[in-house]
From Swiss-Prot:
It comes from Arabidopsis thaliana (Mouse-ear cress). Its main location: cytoplasm. Binds 1 Fe(2+) ion per subunit. This is Homoarginine-6-hydroxylase 2-ODD-C23.2. Its cofactor is Fe(2+). Belongs to the iron/ascorbate-dependent oxidoreductase family.
Length: 357
């Protein structure tokens, strides 16, 4: 039997309007519960050259390794982003989605807008099936021609709504904080894989790209309406900011069962994506997840995707191939150009948008 860690740690999960206190000492697997990781010791030392020698960092790194190996999803607390900001992001997102449809269409997503902007319910497809959500899609902005012919598909400014008025400024501040947080979590993951804290920050993350999906899931009167079909995230690392009072995100565990990602106020849910699977030489596997909002209430989720450089040729890093050699030839070893991979995903997801544009 593997014990998570020896120190008794208590955290909370909000469910059915009350708090259950969980003794993490007793959690020996993640078959019904996602791990909760306080990363504050990591953040306190993240800019120190000798951070890997700090006892607090070592403990966090061990937890990250266990979570990434066993489930690929975990809650992040102690992340340094204020509850006020996290809640304000969700509050103003609700305000946008409550607007009349005609108002939301002012920032309609189109191919000529670089696939940036608002999409109505049913425009997004996962594995060929319609998803029952509406969303605003945003990407890191870049100068025309910066990424050559591949990048032309996504060229253009993000389309931020004029109502709420402060939304653009709020979200740009939030994006910067999520970018910094993601970089620091990846330093811990790099240590967990046996490298230095900075293995990802050379040719892979010198100029990191990002994607943000601001998603609204309507309340339903029938069960098991698929808000977003089962998928893995195609990027590097995801931070999910979800409503505190509705459980809709489900994660597939090692036994093939779907377990709920019950909201913890003030936390992020973090999960690894396909690019990290490749870079880690398959040590960490991206995990299938889906969204089913069985609540009659409207639910919002703001998902921030931290990515490699747009033009990065993603393949297993040498240090991780050395630390974690693989005997078999697998898909993991194949090189992927991130930007092309992203464009392929966008064009597949919005194939109908292309046809009808």
């Amino acid at each position: 039997m593997v014990i998570y860690h020896r120190k008794v740690v208590f955290t909370y999960v909000r469910a059915k309007r009350f708090y259950h206190f969980l003794n993490i000492e007793m959690v020996t697997d993640f078959k019904s519960l996602l791990p909760v990781i306080d990363i504050s010791p990591l953040l306190a030392k993240c800019d120190d050259f000798d951070m890997a020698e700090d006892a607090g960092v070592v403990e966090v790194v061990g937890k990250l390794d266990r979570a990434c190996r066993d489930v690929g999803f975990f809650y992040v607390i102690g992340h340094g982003i204020s509850d006020d900001l996290i809640n304000k992001v969700k509050e103003m997102t609700h305000q946008f989605f409550e607007l009349p449809y005609e108002e939301k269409l002012k920032i309609k997503i189109t191919p000529t807008a670089g696939y940036r902007g608002y999409q109505r319910i049913g425009v997004n497809f996962t594995s060929g099936k319609q998803d029952m959500h509406e969303a605003i899609d945003c990407y890191r902005e870049f100068k025309q021609g910066k990424h050559g012919d591949i990048g032309k598909v996504l060229e253009g400014p993000n389309q931020w709504p004029g109502n709420p008025q402060e939304y653009k400024d709020l979200m740009e501040k939030y994006i910067k904080l999520c970018t910094d947080l993601s970089r620091n979590i990846l330093r811990g993951i790099s240590l967990a894989l046996g490298g230095s804290p900075y293995e990802f920050e050379g040719k892979m993350l010198r100029d990191p790209f990002w994607v943000m999906r601001i998603i609204g899931y309507p309340g339903v009167n029938q069960e098991n309406v698929i808000g977003c079909g089962a998928h893995t995230d195609y990027g590097l690392l995801t931070l999910i900011n979800q409503d505190d009072d509705k459980t809709a995100l489900q994660v597939k565990n090692v036994d093939g069962d779907w377990i709920p990602a019950i909201p913890i106020p003030g936390s992020f849910i973090c999960n690894i994506g396909d690019m990290l699977t490749i870079l880690s030489n398959g040590v960490y596997q991206s995990t299938l997840h889906k969204v089913i909002n069985n609540s009659p209430k409207y639910r919002v989720c703001v998902a921030f995707f931290y990515e490699t450089n747009f033009e990065a040729e993603v393949e297993p890093l040498d240090i991780f191939k050395e630390k974690h050699p693989r005997k078999e030839t697998s898909q993991v070893a194949k090189r992927v150009v991130y930007g092309q991979h992203l464009i392929n995903k966008v064009l597949t997801t919005f194939a109908n948008l292309v046809e009808n544009s």
